[in-house]
């Protein structure tokens, strides 16, 4: 991977925008981060080159030089890859958003940095399926969760009797120096993850993990109007730290589809089957709504797929409670079979409108003539 073009490393096109670049970097940094891939040398190397590529391409000056002269041009200017420069804050923001805590309500994770000696993130996320009506009206649900708690026998270190020894990879510093061309930068040690120490002998109780898993039942109040992809923070129900404090639980909702209603944001769509005679003559019919039913007035000659909009009959907005629209769309129903009496009545109706019985010959005369002319030459 180290021989690849920087754009190929980040899996983006050469004309990608800054936002596209940042999104691609976030995805790959999360995928190859040492915390997610302990003792994986290949992931560690990929993580380094992903950071190197982003440091170059996210800097306008470096990117211009790289586009013209390649990596050699950067080294000739003393502008190799690696951490440093204006984008370090950008990178830390991304890491904090991926691995931090804090935050509140709906949205992403916060920016609390993790203690290097902590074997796991305190915040974690699970998916919570909801029935269609539970999401629309809100509900209270009891869910069982599994969270991590420090191993009492080793004090959460993962080492037998809590005995640790100096990390031989970073010499106990918790960081290692990396070099890219003339530049060098410090990176969290991938072996000890910044702690500066390593396990001498695994704890027999937790097998070196530093934690055990516990289960608990949590009552969740789901607000009305949530939709698939919305996230809810539940403070104090994440993993437990060594000091006894707990992180936060994040719930990502997945809303099941309904048999009749189709949701689009806060709007609700429903298909209304209408017999063709009802559409022609006009009629007032009852249709279901989220709260019950209402009357839909079909005017004479209502068209197939015609829509009728009812304001305030949709889903309440999860933030302000304002309801969306109910949109009823007509689906014309035609009879599959007719008897002789019905056929006779329909033919009389057709004649009363002056409709020609044989494929509208007069209507298509000019078209027939045009087609004949195609074959004359």
Curated annotation (Swiss-Prot):
Record-stated family: Belongs to the DnaJ family.
Binding-site list for Zn(2+) 2: 167, 170, 189, 192
What residues does Zn(2+) 1 bind to? Answer: 151, 154, 203, 206
Query: What species is this protein from?
Result: Sulfurovum sp. (strain NBC37-1)
Residues in CXXCXGXG motif repeats: 151-158, 167-174, 189-196, 203-210
Q: Write out the entry's keywords from A to Z.
A: Chaperone, Cytoplasm, DNA replication, Metal-binding, Repeat, Stress response, Zinc, Zinc-finger
Output the Gene Ontology cellular-component terms: cytoplasm
Cell compartments where the protein resides: Cytoplasm
Domain remark in the UniProt entry: The J domain is necessary and sufficient to stimulate DnaK ATPase activity. Zinc center 1 plays an important role in the autonomous, DnaK-independent chaperone activity of DnaJ. Zinc center 2 is essential for interaction with DnaK and for DnaJ activity.
Q: What are the start-end ranges of the zinc fingers (CR-type)?
A: 138-215
Q: Which domain of life is it from?
A: Bacteria
Question: In its UniProt entry, what is this protein called?
Answer: Chaperone protein DnaJ
Q: Where is the J domain?
A: 5-70
**UniProt GO molecular function:** ATP binding; heat shock protein binding; unfolded protein binding; zinc ion binding
């Amino acid at each position: 991977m180290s021989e690849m073009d920087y754009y190929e490393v980040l899996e983006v096109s050469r004309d990608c925008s800054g936002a596209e670049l940042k999104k691609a970097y976030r995805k790959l940094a999360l995928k190859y981060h040492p915390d997610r891939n302990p003792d994986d040398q290949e992931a560690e190397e990929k993580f380094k080159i992903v950071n190197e590529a982003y440091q170059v391409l996210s800097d306008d000056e470096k990117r211009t030089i790289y586009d013209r002269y390649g990596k050699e041009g950067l080294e000739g200017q003393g502008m190799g890859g690696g951490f440093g420069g204006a984008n370090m804050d950008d990178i830390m923001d991304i890491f904090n958003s991926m691995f931090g805590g804090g935050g509140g309500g709906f949205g992403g994770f916060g920016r609390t940095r993790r203690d290097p000696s902590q074997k796991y993130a305190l915040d974690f996320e699970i998916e919570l399926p909801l029935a269609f009506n539970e999401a629309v009206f809100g509900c209270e649900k009891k869910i069982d969760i599994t969270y991590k708690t420090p191993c009492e026998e080793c004090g959460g270190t993962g080492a037998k009797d809590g005995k640790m020894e100096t990390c031989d990879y970073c010499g106990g510093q918790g960081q290692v120096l990396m070099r890219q061309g003339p530049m060098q930068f410090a990176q969290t040690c991938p072996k000890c993850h910044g702690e500066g120490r390593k396990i001498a002998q695994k704890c027999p109780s937790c097998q070196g993990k530093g934690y055990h898993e516990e289960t608990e039942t949590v009552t969740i109040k789901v607000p009305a109007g949530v939709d698939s992809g919305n996230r809810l923070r539940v403070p104090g129900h994440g993993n437990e730290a060594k000091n006894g404090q707990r992180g936060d639980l994040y719930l990502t909702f997945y809303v099941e589809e309904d048999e009749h209603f189709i949701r689009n944001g806060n709007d609700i769509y429903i298909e209304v089957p209408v017999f063709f005679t009802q559409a022609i003559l006009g009629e007032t019919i009852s249709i279901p709504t989220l709260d019950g039913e209402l009357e839909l007035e079909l005017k004479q000659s209502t068209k197939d797929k015609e829509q009728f909009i009812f304001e305030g009959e949709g889903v309440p907005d999860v933030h302000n409670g304002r309801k969306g629209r109910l949109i009823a769309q007509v689906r014309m129903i035609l009879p599959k079979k007719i008897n002789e009496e019905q056929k006779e009545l329909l033919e009389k109706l057709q004649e009363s409108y002056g409709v020609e019985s044989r494929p509208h010959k007069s209507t298509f005369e000019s078209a027939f003539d045009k087609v004949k002319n195609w074959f004359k030459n």
